[in-house]
Amino acid sequence: MSLFDHGVAKLHTLLKEGEVTVTDLVKESFDRIEATDDQIGAFLTLNEDAFEQAKRMDELAKMSDNPLFGMPIGVKDNIVTKGMRTTCASTFLENFVPAHDATVVERLHDAGALTIGKLNMDEFAMGSSNENSAFKPVRNPWDPTRVPGGSSGGSAASVAAGQVLFSLGSDTGGSIRQPAAYCGVVGMKPTYGLVSRFGLVAFASSLDQIGPLTRTVEDNAYLLNTIAGHCDMDSTSAEVEVPDYTAALNQDLTGMKFALPEEFMAEGVAPGVREQIEKAIETLKSLGATIETVSIPSVKYALSAYYLLASSEASSNLARFDGIRYGRRAEADTLDEVFTYSREQGFGDEVKRRIMLGTYALSSGYYDAFYKKAQQVRTLMKQDFAKVFEEYDAIVGPTAPTTAFKLGEQLDDPLTMYANDIMTIPVNLVGIPAISVPAGLSEGLPVGLQIIGNYFDESTLYRVAHAFEQANGGFKMPQL
């Protein structure tokens, strides 16, 4: 039995009683990484000082009242870590070592969590399969011939494989929830502005959000308790009071009303996924909830609007990578050639594709036809979702239309690859929270149930997800 088979609350008790040490937890993590990461490829950088840090924390653990004290965590490699390489899985930043921690990392360290290392991802968070990493693909612990999802593939795979207790990811169009679904773990994308983006390498600033990936809903709530809250270093950080999310966990679902959008169960949803989601809906009903089918017509435009908006913001954000200020610098004779060659050699194909799309959408003569129209669709979607939340407590449906696909299967078909995020993208465009929770297996591969909430109503999502998890059995460990 692994120590990580216990949740945060139980491990905290064991640490307080001296039955387990922080060093034991770190050893568990490193042993598991050594045993499995050649297969999985989840980590890009490991913390060389982890055991030394753990030894200093061993005695303090008995006195700490913070449930995260001594807990090993993995951090997605687009979240900066002081003194530890942050590459965004790109050769452009292959040797970049930040001088400060992201706010979320600082808050976790203040709580006593210990960073084990940096997790693999799609380059600059652009991808749905984690095949776009410049260094190596991440493989799904349930079947190493399949993708773990993206872009937070390393974050999901590391938790599913038992390499760390929990991890941080980022979600721009589903990059926490889709990998969570594919790997059979819990992934929360919080309300935009609830968690500071300071120290997150920007992809699309109006869509990006950091969130936790864990084995259980309870552990997820503990993690969000720590990282949520206003940050003066982030101009988009919301000034809202952060509740204790664990307080919502043991409430039942009696009298709650959920909406099931017909668009989320339309053609394109794999039969095995549909079957598990229909079972999940029956489980929610048995717990006292009412579920009604609704229509959110604007979601049919979500995919097109998202790729125009996200790519437009990316073309602006990634302009800073020029070979001059930091990162890769190509050898060249002129300044223009430095810019050109550095970006040509430093960026992968998917990053170049999105930069070109975004630059085109923002160019003279096309701005109104593409970018402006996409923003109008975004406004329409916000109105449509607001109408649903006037009558319903949450929205439910599949996290992804299929289970994890084979490595290499969709690399030559970007449009099919993009469609994997069709259920998750609307949440980012609207800015509301959503959680993916394991909903069973289809042909031996995990299926995720997505629960979507209103602005800053993460407590309701945890309430629903926890009740469903307890009834459905929750996390299952893949056999590696």
Curated annotation (Swiss-Prot):
Keyword Protein biosynthesis: yes
Cited Gene3D superfamilies: Amidase signature (AS) domain
SUPFAM superfamilies named among the record's database cross-references: Amidase signature (AS) enzymes
Reactions that this protein is recorded to catalyse: L-glutamyl-tRNA(Gln) + L-glutamine + ATP + H2O = L-glutaminyl-tRNA(Gln) + L-glutamate + ADP + phosphate + H(+)
Annotated keywords: ATP-binding, Ligase, Nucleotide-binding, Protein biosynthesis
Assigned EC number: 6.3.5.7
Domain of life: Bacteria
InterPro entries for the chain: Amidase (IPR000120), Amidase_CS (IPR020556), Amidase_dom (IPR023631), AS_sf (IPR036928), GatA (IPR004412)
Molecular functions (GO terms): ATP binding; glutaminyl-tRNA synthase (glutamine-hydrolyzing) activity
Family: Belongs to the amidase family. GatA subfamily.
Function of the protein: Allows the formation of correctly charged Gln-tRNA(Gln) through the transamidation of misacylated Glu-tRNA(Gln) in organisms which lack glutaminyl-tRNA synthetase. The reaction takes place in the presence of glutamine and ATP through an activated gamma-phospho-Glu-tRNA(Gln).
Subunit structure, interactors included: Heterotrimer of A, B and C subunits.
This protein's name: Glutamyl-tRNA(Gln) amidotransferase subunit A
UniProt organism field: Exiguobacterium sp. (strain ATCC BAA-1283 / AT1b)
